[in-house]
Amino acid sequence: DITPVQVKSVEQQALQGLHRIRSLWMGTRTSRINALRGFCREFGIAIAAGSRTGVENISRVLADPNSAVPEMIRGTLKLLIEEIRLMEARIAQIERELTQVAKDSDACKLLLSIPGVGLLTSTAMVAATSGKVTHFKDARHFASWFGLTPKEYSSGNSRRLGRISKKGDR
């Protein structure tokens, strides 16, 4: 038996595309921040974790002519900071677009009324299902399909369940 699947509308595909692009840009931003922190560590400068404070601290270090960062690499590190800020602006733009989608969608409004469901979860659910979950046998099947099941860590006879996997609909 082959289980039939619902075909996504063009709007659902576009909304899902926004989520995927946002995720891609988040990964790019994180990669750049980690690279910056790594370069600073190589020159003996410890920068605390966290995107906002970390980037601002690195900017101050690069602006200080007496810091341990060699002049040869300062310009390139400043370009990395510009890339991070560009990614943050792009992510914010997508989040504004998602906010508008949530305001215009009755299904999103209903989902947002549930405690613990925010903008990203509600719009991702609408992108995945168009707000209609009647074709799922029960809530457990929907949660599993959507990726809200715990990640399993097993070894020998021990079995531990971790945080939710968030790997559904891929």
Labelled PLM ranges:
Residues D1-T3, R32-A35, I91-A92, S130-T134:
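Short helix-capping/linker segments at secondary-structure and domain boundaries
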